[in-house]
Design a protein with these regions (language model features):
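Helix-turn-helix DNA-binding motif, specifically the short coil turn and the N-cap/start of the second
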Residues: 1-4, 8
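C-terminal regulatory
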Residues: 107-109, 119-239, 266-267
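A short LG(V/I)-centered, amphipathic sequence patch enriched
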Residues: 13-30
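Central regulatory/effector-binding core of bacterial HTH transcription factors
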Residues: 62-125
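Conserved amphipathic alpha-helical core elements
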Residues: 12-13, 225
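Short helix-loop hinge/linker segments at domain boundaries
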Residues: 25-28, 35, 46-68
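A bilobed periplasmic-binding-protein/Venus flytrap-type ligand-binding module shared by bacterial periplasmic
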Residues: 239-248
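Short amphipathic alpha-helical coupling segments at ligand-binding clamshell hinges
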Residues: 77, 212, 248-262
Length: 267
């Protein structure tokens, strides 16, 4: 019951000699001491979990794996991979969250995050999964109607589909010409925080989208989308699997990371 939990928390705070929570009549939140204590507990539990798995050697993988990934990669690649992985390891449970926002893996308790680089967060360890170019894409019917750009500045006259991440729409697209890297501001009548939505709109002929190769490879091959300005595209984008630093990885997480890297490289 709530009263039992309250008493237990008060006893814990008394024993530690620190206030772990801020309490109001309507909310309960962690203090800085509480956040540090929670992270230490999470790390300890993860290390104990890894130690127990280590004792079982090569026995069946067990336990929960929490993963977050981008919408496009999650739907196109990660979901089929998880289906196959769980068929091979039936005692594992996967908790998957798809979002194009950058989440705090530590605070939100994720084991693995799938992100594109660069990765400025030193609190994370990372493993490179794949490198690939980006493409300026639209449906062939859109290009036929509005014309195919021959230089990035031509995008100013096109309806560009914008990814809106955490309230900060990505209106600036990067390009390169010879040794020069430059940016072009683009705009259009549609923004979304889900890359899959942008892809769907582009296939429907609504406008131009900037996508990573691994997100639209099948669409390009099938002719649903057509790329332009490939000669101006900037450096390839890295796709990483990241996990919190400073904690031992449970064997189930390590095995999944290795299998995912092999799967992505093979595909």
């Amino acid at each position: 019951s709530p009263s039992t939990v309250t008493v237990a928390l008060q006893k814990l705070e008394s024993r530690l000699g620190a206030q772990l929570f801020r309490r109001t009549t309507r909310s309960l939140s962690l203090t800085p001491d509480g956040e540090r204590f929670l992270e230490t507990c999470r790390r300890t539990i993860a290390e104990l979990d890894a130690a127990m798995e280590g004792l079982t050697g090569h026995g069946p993988l067990r336990g929960r794996i929490r993963i977050t990934a981008t919408n496009d990669f999650g739907r196109a690649t990660l979901c089929p991979f998880i289906h196959t992985f769980l068929a091979q390891h039936p005692d594992v449970v996967v908790d998957l969250l798809l979002t194009d926002d950058i989440l705090d893996l530590v605070d939100e308790g994720f084991d693995i995050g799938i992100r594109t680089g660069p990765l400025p967060d030193s609190a994370l360890h990372f493993r490179l999964l794949v490198r690939g170019p980006r493409h300026i894409c639209a449906a062939p019917a859109y290009w036929d109607e509005h014309g195919r750009p021959t230089h990035p500045r031509d995008l100013a006259s096109h309806n560009c589909l914008i990814l809106g991440r955490s309230g900060a729409p990505l209106h600036t697209w990067r390009f390169q010409s010879a040794d020069e890297t430059f940016s072009i501001r683009v705009d259009g009548d549609r923004l979304a925080n889900d890359g899959e939505v942008l892809r769907t709109w582009a296939i429907a002929g609504a406008g131009v989208v900037l996508k990573s190769r691994w997100d639209v490879a099948d669409d390009l091959a099938a002719g649903r989308l057509e790329s332009c300005l490939d000669a101006f595209m900037a450096d390839p984008v890295n796709l990483y699997a990241v996990h919190p630093a400073g904690r031992a990885l449970p064997r189930r997480v390590e095995v999944m990371l290795t299998a995912l890297a092999d799967h992505v490289t093979g595909s």
